[in-house]
Amino acid sequence: MSGRTYRVTGINLKGIPLGEADRIVTILTREQGLIRAVAKGSRKQPSKLGGRMEPFVINDLLMVRGRWSAQTETSQRLQRIVQAETLQTFPRLSRSLAHLTAAQYLAEVALLLALPDQAQEELFVVLVEHLERIERAASEQAVLPLLTHGLYHLLALAGFAPQVQACYFCQGGLVGSVFFSPQWGGLICDPCRVAQRPSPIAWVSASALRALGSLPSSTLPLPEDSLPLAAWLEAERLLRRVLEHHTDREIRSAELLASCYAVPTANGQGSPAFPEGHPEKWASA
């Protein structure tokens, strides 16, 4: 191989058209972190690269280092994909909108956390592991806890994981009213809320507190149906606030996720299944 060619293993997270026949693919790789590469002719039929460039396909890739391009999404050099050998796909992610949306959600998170030109094997492994769990989920109801679990583990990998098993300030137990602040590192007991006055802050329901407390485990200890979907929606929403605080970016898939788990209201419209009385706005302490 020449000095400009190299091999990586990567999972496709995003693709955008380029011209009439090509595609720019954003790939999370074990060896080089996040790379953006041109898949020439991949939108033509037939094409050796076509199906291999779809989202959530893991390939062994032969790459050519590109030259500087002012048209790329960032200031990275644009690479070129020469060959791709598929190692793994996730066909069952398309079994429902919830499965696919959860996968897209975690892909968005990985895109926010990944770094270019740096080996990020652990991020690659954690993302793939949680995509496999979501793909195996037997029902849409089972997807949401797995998504929330994956979100927490990605936050932990980036050093952003909030405190979810004790009060952030006093490290004491969580009894009575419990609150959550993304800026202040997670759960806060009521006495510390009064003393420290963190802001913004949200009240946490008892069921969401249980959901949050289960997340640091490598696998979810709770049966998938032991908590209402509202608890997992609430937990996901709180963790998403942490991600947004640290990255200053929103997760576009979150709105679609909420619609997947909407419950009918009296007028027949859907609304997110938050528990009765849960505040919809974050308040000052």
From Swiss-Prot:
Record's keyword annotation contains DNA repair: yes
Disulfide bonds: none
Keywords: DNA damage, DNA recombination, DNA repair
GO cellular component: bacterial nucleoid
Family note: Belongs to the RecO family.
Biological role: Involved in DNA repair and RecF pathway recombination.
Species whose genome carries this gene: Synechococcus sp. (strain JA-2-3B'a(2-13))
Superkingdom in the source lineage: Bacteria
Gene it is expressed from: recO
Residue runs in coiled coils: none
InterPro entries: ARFGAP/RecO (IPR037278), DNA_rep/recomb_RecO_N (IPR022572), NA-bd_OB-fold (IPR012340), RecO (IPR003717), RecO_C (IPR042242)
GO terms under biological process: DNA recombination; double-strand break repair
Protein name: DNA repair protein RecO
